[in-house]
Amino acid sequence: PAGMGGKKTVLVFVVGETARADHFSLNGYGRDTNPQLEKRGVVSFGNVWSCGTSTAESVPCMFSDLPRSQYSSGRAAFRENLLDILVRADVDVLWLENNSSCKGVCARVPARTTWEADDKRFCTDGECLDDLLIDQLRQAISANNDRDLVVVMHQIGSHGPSYFKRYTQDYRRFAPTCDTNQLQSCSQEQIV
């Protein structure tokens, strides 16, 4: 069903599971790390903790109904997740992937991966910048037939150790930078 007043509702859920909430200016960090997000009035959940340090653990946990203290991948595998509930509520769901995978969370919903697109504007050697997700989001919204839609965008974000490959020169704002995947060769100032 369409949202309030017959208009479709579009919710974009950005999964940046490698992002540190304490390094978001949206959450009070001293450096202006999220200027574009601040302009959009987004909701940042800064008081949230992951179930684990790996994508395989953290992503399924985010979409599980289990509390963090009771979460296990074995228990979650046999339960509905948030996306399943949305589909049962007659909401269209699309998963846009620019990370290693959805780790089973999107198994029962339509999903697209950036590496399938192989868009030369954003992709090099099989890795794509998160910017490509914006193009895919625009396509998904325009193709949607006036139905409520939830789009999950799973970013590569700040996955390391090749942090310097996660953004273009246009976004290089904080110097000095660590331009190698050999982090031991970089100073603390370059890394943070």
Language-model regions: role of each:
Residues 1-13, 18-182:
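Active-site-proximal alpha/beta segments of enzymes that process anionic O-linked groups
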Residues 182-192:
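Active-site-proximal segments of metal-dependent phosphoesterases and phosphodiesterases across multiple
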